[in-house]
Each structure stands twice: as structure tokens, then as C-alpha cells.
Amino acid sequence: MKSFKIISLLLAILFLASCQTNTASDDEALETVEVMLDWYPNAVHTFLYVAIENGYFAEEGLDVDIVFPTNPTDPIQLTASGAIPLALSYQPDVILARSKDLPVVSVASVVRSPLNHVMFLAEQDFDSPADLVGLTVGYPGIPVNEPILKTMVEAAGGDYEQVHLMDVGFELGASIVSGRADAVVGTYINHEYPVLKHEGHDISYFNPVDYGVPEYDELVLISNEAYVEESGEVLAAFWRAALKGYEWMVENPDEALNVLLTNQDEANFPLIQEVEEESLSILLEKMENPNGPFGGQDAESWEEVISWLDAHDWLEQPVVAEDAFSSITD
């Protein structure tokens, strides 16, 4: 009887050790992939958090680690250097970066039309972007905002050279509320606008597409040329999981938003539920691809944005559309 107990105990120990070994092996099998957001976590990132929470990345053998930028230019700079394999950025910024020989590549479209609007307190009573001449416009230091603002001011008949542009970092809404800036560009219709409304401010805005700016992709997933060439299977696996997260978000928007709110960085970037609800309702339409799968890209869109930037002398050297993006959605 005593021998039986000893054998049973040994078998139990071996079983537990086997379980622990299998768990460790499973964890070791996952490849860690860092993804840098374009901003702090908000509704546009919901599909990524859903893919993590629902285990879609793990099913593809990936352990996805979401990191935040310390300043608005980090996604482009750190991806170009290879310090970060994946990041969220903006279609025009990818083109501007490539014109400076930075080896960044868009691998998927996330938001298919501009969210970026010029915003100001309604009491300013501006009629068009031409009214910004002689005034101070805040922006987050992201290069794409300059050609956007220049195009808008000139389309409205104003002299862009007489607009004072001031880098306010992430303090976009605060800069117009405090009076530090008369208006801001780089503010999003799905984020700063509902946030400022929630805070009790009456806000007006100009949509860039009404003033000569093309319908560019607001948000794209970027990588660098070397990673795209060497890690194509990882990128494909990443997007398969991201697509599942997106589809689940579309079918279950309320539950998906709860996933985001549960995973928010409340200490540093607290989210407001009603703001994120309004934001997600705006985003769902703008993220949908009517001509193919979520994330799909085409040369025509890239050529249009390249032509716009080139026409306004923002490109340091020519950019070939086909070199600026690589499809991982097929």
C-alpha cells in the first residue's frame, strides 16, 4: 500500500511537470511582435485589442506587444530604423518619408479616408481656411499636417506663408481652449472633436477634402523594407489575426469597445466611454473597404496622394507608388 502511494505521488509529480513543460513550450513557440500605435489607445485600435483578447494572434503563433509613441514622429522613425517592426502611421507620411530615403512601407490600410480636420472654437467664427492667415495654428509635429494646411489655405484663397505654424505636440485640444493657438490641424473628427464636445466646448472645423486635399488613407500599418522581405509569413499571420479582430469588432461593436476600455492605460491615457462610442461609430464606415478585404491597398490611391504632394513641392525626390506599399491581405 505504501509503495502504491509513492508510485501515485511520483506519477502526479511527473504529470504536473509535463503540464508545466508543455505550457512553457507553447509560450516559447509564440513569436513576439511589437506594434507601435500612432497615438495613445483609442477606438481606432479596438480591432488589435480584440485580436489579442480573443486569442487570434496566439492562434497564429504570435505574441503581440502594443507599445505607445513618446512623440508623434516615433512610428515612422523607429520603424524606418528597424527598432519597431510594425507601427500605425499615415499614408502621406509614408510618402514623405520615402522621399527622404527612409525605407518604410505600408502593408495594410486601416482607415480609408481623412479623419484629420482643422478645428477651432466656434466663437472664432471662421468662414474658410483663408481666415487663418496672420494667425497661429497648432499641430503635433507630424509632417503631413503642413501640406494639408497649405493646400486648404491656398484653395480658399489665402497666403499660407502668412500662417504661423506652432508645434504643440500632443496638446492639440488644450492649445485652442487655452488660446495658445487660434486653430489646430492634426485633430481628428473621431477623437478630439467628441472629446472637446464632452468637455463642454463648442467646436467648429474644416474638412480637408473640401479644400483640395485628396481622400488619402488616414491610417496605415507600416513596416520597413527589410522586415517585409524577411518576415513575410509573420506579416501574413499578423494580418489574418487582425482581420479576425476587425470582423469580430464589426459584428460586436459594444463588446469590442468594452475590450478596449478594459485594456486602456487608465493611469496615463484614460478613455471616456461615450467619446469612444461616438468615435467607433464614425470609424466603422471609414475602415470598411467596399472594393475588397479590410486592409487592401491599390496603386491608384498612392499615385493620387503622391501627385498631390509633388504638386505642392513637398517631395525631396520622386516616389514610386508601387514601392511605397506591399500587400499582406491576399
UniProtKB/Swiss-Prot annotation:
It is found in: Cell membrane. InterPro entries: NMT1/THI5, SsuA/THI5. Keywords: Cell membrane, Lipoprotein, Membrane, Palmitate, Signal, Transport. Residues 1-18 form the signal peptide. The keyword Protease does not apply. Substrate binds at residues 38-39, 90, 145, 188, 192. GO terms for biological process: thiamine biosynthetic process; thiamine diphosphate biosynthetic process. This is Formylaminopyrimidine-binding protein. It comes from Halalkalibacterium halodurans (strain ATCC BAA-125 / DSM 18197 / FERM 7344 / JCM 9153 / C-125).
